Amino acid sequence: MARVLRDGAFSGETHIVTGAVQGIGRAVATTLAEHGAQLLLVDLDAGRLAETAAEIGRVAQVKPIFAAANVAEEAHVQRAVAHALDATGVVNGVVNVAGITRDARIPKKSFDDFKLVVGVHLYGTFLFLREVAAQCWHAQFKNAGNQPLDDGVNRFVVNFSSVSARNGNVGQIDYTAAKGAIEAATRTAAREFSAYRARVNAIAPGPVNTPMLAAVGEEGMRAMGRATLVGRVAEPQDIASFVCALADPRISGYVTGQVFPVNGGIYLA
């Protein structure tokens, strides 16, 4: 889908991407930048963020800024969004990719791990939804006399669920619960953010060739690929291209409150 985007589709816009140093997040950030977006990259590791920003700067005509932050920490997210706003003057969109797993079956699942996983996925998604709205879009709404923002400005959110939210996954009660909650939160945010004319959608990928999936090994990856209808696991770019389509109002300007199963047919909704 990235191929159908206009050149410079996101020029003059600032997008926030969490989980930006590897896998899906890095592919999303790179593809958005290639189509003109200024970026705030968010992840835990400042060194890897600097490397990622430099690499994106070499392949795109933008120089991303970044913020080392724990997405589950309120103050970190507040500072990250403020940094984007101070540096660029605008935030048009946020892509909530950041995620972790701590697999264990329910009898062995520690409460600390449960809270950690839910925190990164669900709390992180909520905090970026809240802060982008509070610091950026709600002020514009108030300045417009509390009237819908029919100003032609592109505003969007793309959240990340998972096929596991619908199908379950052994050892991942924390991950699957958080992803299911993100789907519900996406629908609520779509209703609330309609006043800002911001589109809020989510993607529910199947297996993707990322470091998070590497633990299954090559044979496990091939087996997952065989379980899909397209015969392979996704590459990060498959997901990034769909994100960019959701970010572009000329492609998805009439789409909000939806969860898209970008999963190769491994699960049919």
Language-model segments: which ranges?
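Conserved glycine-rich cofactor-binding loop
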Residues: T14, V21-Q22
